[in-house]
């Protein structure tokens, strides 16, 4: 059975210990005792076939602490994990002691109260800088491969959003609950894995907090080498498909008969004759005179040719006549 180390941090009195007790014992503590250091251990069942990307896990969260994905659906195909929960003190007196439990942590939970803006502001002003300085969150595979910190942001005391006394108190202080828009912007800007809300008093969303934390902890992102290999294979397949289609097009072009682009070969005979008749423009008067001149010139050339032929013929002489007469026989 794989063991998951989960460390919970956040301001004092935001409900970290109450969250852990509510999850492990199904009860809500009524007395507040500041935590110095405590450790809880339990077994959690996670359905097989985790999401292929952390974004899919986050999309299953309705932002109010209930997952609509595989965590809430009944399934017999589950895998057991041992989750070790490390509770820490949020007071400044323990700033030097607290980082001793950070090494080899699989997932961090940074908690804040949805009704206290000061605890929400400390997420980026105190807790994230402390983790960067005293832990190895920037050396995890999630950060090196995805640019995401192994951190789940948790809003506690979600039941106070509908509490009239808390609403009145916030109005008197000219304040309000931490809005969902503020939370989404912080998660995106800081590179957290996701966000969820819960209430230890009503146990709403408590179980889903740790199921989601385990999913993030066991998620194994694709390495850059695997991505490069997959992209290379995809490019090769695309190139091969393109070349095959190109060769096919060339063969089809070679098999097609050659067509002349001239107008005479593309137009039908009837339409070609009509087009020629339409383009046959009647000659002008000047053109008629030129035609008559050409005809007379042609006749004159024929007469001249006949005269020349007659001149070349030899005329008969007197001697020729005498020779004919001398042929007569005298009896």
Curated annotation (Swiss-Prot):
Q: How does it sit in the membrane?
A: Lipid-anchor
Q: What would changing residue 91 to H do, according to UniProt?
A: Cells sensitive to calcofluor, caffeine and Congo red
Q: Which residues carry this modification: Cysteine methyl ester?
A: 328
**Full protein name:** GTP-binding protein RHO5
| Chief location of this protein within or outside the cell | membrane
- Keywords assigned: GTP-binding, Isopeptide bond, Lipoprotein, Membrane, Methylation, Mitochondrion, Nucleotide-binding, Phosphoprotein, Prenylation, Ubl conjugation
CDD domains annotated for this entry? Answer: Rho
Q: Per the similarity annotation, which family is this? A: Belongs to the small GTPase superfamily. Rho family.
The record's subcellular location field reads:
Membrane; Mitochondrion
Instruction: List, alphabetically, the Pfam families matched.
Output: Ras (PF00071)
Q: Name one GO biological process term.
A: regulation of actin cytoskeleton organization
How does it associate, per the subunit comment? Interacts with RGD2.
Which positions bear Phosphothreonine? 232, 244
Note on file? Present with 2180 molecules/cell in log phase SD medium.
- Bias category Polar residues: which stretches? 258-273
């Amino acid at each position: 059975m794989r063991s998951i180390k989960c460390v919970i941090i956040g301001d004092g009195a935001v409900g970290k210990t109450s969250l852990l007790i509510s999850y492990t014992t199904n009860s809500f503590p009524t007395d507040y005792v500041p935590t110095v250091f405590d450790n809880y251990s339990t077994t959690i069942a996670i359905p097989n076939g985790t999401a292929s990307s952390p974004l899919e896990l986050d999309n299953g969260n309705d932002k109010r602490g209930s997952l609509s994905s595989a965590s809430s659906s009944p399934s017999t195909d589950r895998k057991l994990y041992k989750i070790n929960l490390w509770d820490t003190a949020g007071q400044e007196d323990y700033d030097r002691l607290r980082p001793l439990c950070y090494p080899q942590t699989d997932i961090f939970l940074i908690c804040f109260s949805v009704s206290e803006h000061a605890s929400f502001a400390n997420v980026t002003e105190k807790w994230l800088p402390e983790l960067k300085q005293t832990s190895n969150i920037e050396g995890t595979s999630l950060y090196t491969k995805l640019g995401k910190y192994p951190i789940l942001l948790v809003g506690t005391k979600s039941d106070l959003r509908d509490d009239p006394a808390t609403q009145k108190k916030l109005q008197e202080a000219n304040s309000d609950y931490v809005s969902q828009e503020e939370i989404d912007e912080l998660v995106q800007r800081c590179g957290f894995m996701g966000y969820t809300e819960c209430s230890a008093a009503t146990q709403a969303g408590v179980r889903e907090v740790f199921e989601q934390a385990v999913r993030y902890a066991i998620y194994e992102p694709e390495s850059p080498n695997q991505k490069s290999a997959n992209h290379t294979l995809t490019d090769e397949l695309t190139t091969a498909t393109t070349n095959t289609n190109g060769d096919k097009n060339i063969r089809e072009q070679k098999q097609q008969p050659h067509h002349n682009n001239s107008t005479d070969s593309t137009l039908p005979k009837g339409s070609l004759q009509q087009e020629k008749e339409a383009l046959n423009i009647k000659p002008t008067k000047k053109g008629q005179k030129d035609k008559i001149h050409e005809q007379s010139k042609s006749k004159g050339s024929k007469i001249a040719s006949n005269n020349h032929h007659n001149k070349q013929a030899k005329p008969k002489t007197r001697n020729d006549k005498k020779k004919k007469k001398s042929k007569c026989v005298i009896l």
